[in-house]
Amino acid sequence: MVLGGKAVAGKGYYYPPTLLLDVRQDMAIMHEETFGPVLPVVSFDTLEQALTMANDSDYGLTSSIYTQNLNTAMKAIKGLKFGETYINRENFEAMQGFHAGWRKSGIGGADGKHGL
């Protein structure tokens, strides 16, 4: 753990941004759905390896890929088993859009005219 990892003192239930380095695929953080500002950093050699690692979970709410190559982004979108995949940005929820998780990340969807 490089940053964060301890609850903030005081009123409320706040958790600081947390950065985890040297994360391995067999660690729970790679398989559980974490709602919080926690970023596990994992090394990979190929896009296929990264997709396999990302999909190695029962959950699939949202994913992001950062790349300068449009072909790489499109391959990632097709290969990731997530309800939403963002390119070169973090999770952003536009209320006009329909949002849905995949696998154990929820049933149905929310927002937009189809989510009402």
Write out the residue ranges for each language-model feature:
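Short secondary-structure junctions
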Residues: 1-5
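Conserved C-terminal structural/oligomerization subdomain of aldehyde/semialdehyde dehydrogenase
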Residues: 7, 14-116
